[in-house]
């Protein structure tokens, strides 16, 4: 990654759930590998104020707002306790001497826009995930899926407990399809593999058809071989610059004529980290999270970093 990016810190969002503590541990270790600051945050939504045109209902609204202010005060106090506990988890997951680089903070605002705006100024935002289609907690519910669509930088989604547990030498896996976000994913994946001292598996699944669809094409064997050679050369070209920059990383190239999601899910079962672009072939900046990225995140099989190219437009509330 660029010098500017590697000097930026990491932010982890918490909500007090067990899987958010897992995310804190992962973020603390990643921040330590990068030797950057870690910021533990919880975002508390603001108190709702009376909209215009409610004058005749204002007295009733005042009573509701009083109750909400009391509840909001409780949520703020609870948030401080959650951040304090998460801060302790981060310290325990880090080596001695890191205390000054780990801070905690309660923020006030709409959750997704707040975290998305923070993502402009940090190397990565980290959130926890329960896996198997269930996202944990109020903060980590729709927030995870919304943030990976609106963030201005990488978002790491960490499952509570990858199944089965991965050994320290498990590889990093990256999906490469030629899109701009997969190029950013390659940069992140090489950097992570280098810092972890593990191999990198680069997957290029070059078709959107499944294996059962190909017999209908009636292609000659030489046509298949030529196409496979072309795809292998394409992957080699896209990785060559990164291999020159990270000569310590052993790269295993996997080129298959298949849909990318099933192959990434297969590789994720033995990976310690999967890196994917926020959208792939045919994608464009600002579109919803791609089907491949969504499938890998939802599987909960391994921590996933979703690479997202920064966007200029304001984040919707």
Curated annotation (Swiss-Prot):
Q: Which InterPro entries match?
A: Rossmann-like_a/b/a_fold, Universal_stress_UspA, UspA
Q: Binding of ATP 1: at which residues?
A: 13, 128-134, 142-143
The record's GO CC annotations read:
peptidoglycan-based cell wall; plasma membrane
Q: What terms describe the molecular function in GO for this protein? A: ATP binding
Cross-link position, Isoglutamyl lysine isopeptide (Lys-Gln) (interchain with Q-Cter in protein Pup)? 88
Any matching Pfam family: Usp
**Domain of life of the native organism:** Bacteria
Which UniProt key words apply to this protein? ATP-binding, Isopeptide bond, Nucleotide-binding, Ubl conjugation
- UniProt-annotated binding residues for ATP 2: 175, 208, 277-283, 291-293
Phenotype of null mutants: No visible phenotype under normal or hypoxic and normoxic stationary phase growth, nor in mouse- or human-derived macrophage cell lines.
Residues spanning the membrane: none
Q: Does the keyword DNA repair apply?
A: no
- What induces it, per record? A member of the dormancy regulon. Induced in response to reduced oxygen tension (hypoxia), low levels of nitric oxide (NO) and carbon monoxide (CO). It is hoped that this regulon will give insight into the latent, or dormant phase of infection.
Q: Which family does it belong to?
A: Belongs to the universal stress protein A family.
The family database entries (PANTHER family) matched by this protein are listed as:
STRESS RESPONSE PROTEIN NHAX, UNIVERSAL STRESS PROTEIN RV2623
Quote the protein name from its UniProt record: Universal stress protein Rv1996
* Source organism (scientific name): Mycobacterium tuberculosis (strain ATCC 25618 / H37Rv)
């Amino acid at each position: 990654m660029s010098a500017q990016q590697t000097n930026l810190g990491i932010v982890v969002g918490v909500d007090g759930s067990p899987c958010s503590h897992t995310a804190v541990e992962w973020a603390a270790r990643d921040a330590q590998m990068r030797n950057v600051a870690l910021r533990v945050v919880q975002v508390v939504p603001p108190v709702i104020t009376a909209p215009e045109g409610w004058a005749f209902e204002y007295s009733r609204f005042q009573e509701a707002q009083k109750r909400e202010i009391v509840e909001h005060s409780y949520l703020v106090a609870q948030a401080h306790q959650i951040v304090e506990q998460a801060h302790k988890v981060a310290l325990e997951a880090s080596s001695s001497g890191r205390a000054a680089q780990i801070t905690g903070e309660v923020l006030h605002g709409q959750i997704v826009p707040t975290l998305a705006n923070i993502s402009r100024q940090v190397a990565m935002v980290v959130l926890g995930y329960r896996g198997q289609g269930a996202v944990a907690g109020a903060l980590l519910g729709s927030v995870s899926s919304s943030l990976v669509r609106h963030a201005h930088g990488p978002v790491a989604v960490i499952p509570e407990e990858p199944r089965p547990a991965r050994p320290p030498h498990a590889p990093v896996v990256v999906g490469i399809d030629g899109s701009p976000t997969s190029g950013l994913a390659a940069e992140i994946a090489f950097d992570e593999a280098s810092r972890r001292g593990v191999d990198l598996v680069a997957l290029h699944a070059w078709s959107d058809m499944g294996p059962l669809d190909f017999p209908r094409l009636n292609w000659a064997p030489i046509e298949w071989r030529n196409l496979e050679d072309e795809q292998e050369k394409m992957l080699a070209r896209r990785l060559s610059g990164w291999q020159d920059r990270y000569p310590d990383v052993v790269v295993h190239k996997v080129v298959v004529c298949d849909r990318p999601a099933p192959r990434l899910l297969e590789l994720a079962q033995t990976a310690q980290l999967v890196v994917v672009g926020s959208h792939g072939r045919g994608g464009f900046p600002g579109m919803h999270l791609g089907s491949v990225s969504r499938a890998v995140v939802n599987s909960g099989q391994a921590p996933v970093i979703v690479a997202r190219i920064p966007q200029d437009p304001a984040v919707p509330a």
